[in-house]
């Protein structure tokens, strides 16, 4: 049962800390270095994640990226108060610009070093499309996370709107997840019948501010809902997150 609690917030935290956007890749020879700090919570778990990442466009059609997050979490379970910290699921990604507005992506997620992380390797892949207007960008995407069936195997799709104003961008994103969780064998050999719901969604809103020609600050908030996250039997509420990311553009 406690594994179920952990994986609900792990899934939310992993998605919330995907730092890169859904618009076309950067120009050849350019890139970004990112440093992020955020707070995620889903009772009875809460904590802070710090992450460092980099992405670089080696070619006009190829972008390479990496993200390494560290988690500092605490939770209360069966009368015990536990603190955990360590490496969460590191991510390595490739993105291919196949035509104007269309790109393919493949990401690999490595196992983490603490209990609050996915404990198996997972691969994520999909298609992105974006329309660029004078002051509005509209992005759409569809993808599939291929990992352990009980924790992180699902289809997802979503859309993002970015509105460009003077020296800053306001954006909003909606992501829908669809996938079936399987019954899981708990520790001690007992079969758990807590087959979870299949659907969930994530809603995020944020602002990107150009501090200088090379520094951009991104402040965001995310909320998760649906039976993939919420579970009344386990007394799980809706997860939420707040974060701030500083980008160095080169």
Report residues per predicted region.
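Short glycine/proline- and aromatic-enriched beta-strand/turn motifs that initiate or cap beta-hairpins
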Residues: 17-73, 249
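Residues on the lipid-exposed face of transmembrane beta-strands in outer-membrane beta-barrel proteins
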Residues: 37, 52-56, 92-96, 123-131, ...
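Transmembrane beta-strands of outer-membrane beta-barrel pores
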Residues: 37-43, 68-74, 108-114, 121, ...
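Flexible, solvent-exposed loop segments that connect beta-strands
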Residues: 39-43, 72-85, 114-116, 146-150, ...
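Residues that define the transmembrane beta-barrel architecture of outer-membrane proteins
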Residues: 46-50, 84-90, 117-123, 151-157, ...
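Repeated loop/turn-to-beta-strand initiation elements of outer-membrane beta-barrel proteins
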Residues: 60-66, 100-106, 132-141, 167-172, ...
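Hydrophobic alpha-helical segments and helix pairs
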Residues: 81-128
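Predominantly the C-terminal beta-signal and adjacent terminal strand-loop region
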Residues: 176, 180-250
């Amino acid at each position: 049962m406690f594994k179920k609690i952990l994986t609900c917030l792990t899934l939310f935290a992993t998605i919330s800390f995907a730092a890169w956007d859904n618009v076309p890749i950067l120009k050849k020879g350019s890139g970004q270095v990112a440093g992020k700090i955020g707070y995620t919570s889903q009772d009875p778990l809460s904590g802070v994640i710090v992450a460092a990442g980099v992405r670089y466009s080696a070619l006009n059609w190829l972008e390479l990226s990496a993200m390494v997050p560290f988690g500092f979490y605490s939770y209360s379970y069966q009368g015990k108060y536990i603190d955990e910290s360590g490496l969460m699921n590191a991510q390595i990604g490739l993105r291919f610009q196949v035509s104007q507005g269309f790109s393919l992506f493949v990401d690999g997620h490595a196992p983490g070093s603490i209990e609050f992380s996915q404990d198996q390797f997972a691969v994520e892949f999909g298609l992105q499309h974006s329309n660029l207007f004078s002051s509005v960008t509209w992005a759409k995407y569809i993808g599939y996370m291929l990992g352990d069936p009980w924790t992180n195997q699902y289809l997802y799709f979503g859309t993002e709107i970015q509105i460009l104003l003077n020296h800053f961008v306001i954006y909003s994103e909606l992501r829908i997840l669809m996938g079936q969780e399987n019954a899981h064998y708990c520790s001690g050999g007992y079969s758990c019948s807590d087959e979870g719901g299949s659907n969930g969604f994530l809603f995020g809103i944020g602002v990107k501010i150009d501090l200088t020609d090379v520094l951009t600050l991104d402040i965001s908030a995310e909320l998760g809902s649906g039976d993939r996250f919420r579970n009344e039997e386990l007394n799980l509420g809706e997860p939420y997150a707040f974060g701030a990311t500083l980008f160095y553009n080169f």
